[in-house]
Amino acid sequence: MKKLLAIALTVLATVFAFGTPAFAADAAAGAQVFAANCAACHAGGNNAVMPTKTLKADALKTYLAGYKDGSKSLEEAVAYQVTNGQGAMPAFGGRLSDADIANVAAYIADQAENNKW
C-alpha cells in the first residue's frame, strides 16, 4: 500500500511540475486580436506612423524597451508595449484583456522570430 501511495504521489508531482502552465499564450487567437486592434497601423508588420519602427525582428531589437537590453523576452517586451503604449502608440491595457495582450504578443513574437512579416 505504501508503495502504491508513493507511486501515485510521484506521478502527481511530475504532472504538476511539468504539466501545462495555467495560461499559455495562443498565437492563433493573437492573430485575431491583431487583425481587430493592431492591423490599422501595423499591417504586414509595418508601421504606418513611424515607418522605421516595424514589427520585424531586427527593428524590434533596436527599439523595443526590455528586449533590446535582454531584460525581457520578445513576448514580454511586446506585452509591456501593448499594455502601456509609448509615443504615438496608445496603451491597450484596460481595453484588451490580459489574455488578449498575451495572445497578441505571442502572435507578434512568432511572426517576427520566424520572419513571417
UniProtKB/Swiss-Prot annotation:
Domain of life: Bacteria
GO cellular component: plasma membrane-derived thylakoid lumen
The keyword Transport is annotated on this UniProt entry: yes
BP term (GO), one: photosynthesis
Record's keyword terms, sorted: Electron transport, Heme, Iron, Metal-binding, Photosynthesis, Signal, Thylakoid, Transport
A Pfam family assignment: Cytochrome_CBB3
Compartment(s) where it occurs, according to its Swiss-Prot or TrEMBL record: Cellular thylakoid lumen
Any GO molecular function: electron transfer activity
PTM note: Binds 1 heme c group covalently per subunit.
Signal peptide start and end residues: 1-24
Binding site for heme c: 38, 41-42, 89
InterPro entries: Cyt_c-like_dom, Cyt_c-like_dom_sf, Cyt_C6, Cyt_C_IC
Family: Belongs to the cytochrome c family. PetJ subfamily.
Entry function: Functions as an electron carrier between membrane-bound cytochrome b6-f and photosystem I in oxygenic photosynthesis.
Subunit structure: Monomer.
PANTHER family referenced in this protein's UniProt entry, alphabetically: CYTOCHROME C6, CHLOROPLASTIC
Protein name, entry field: Cytochrome c6
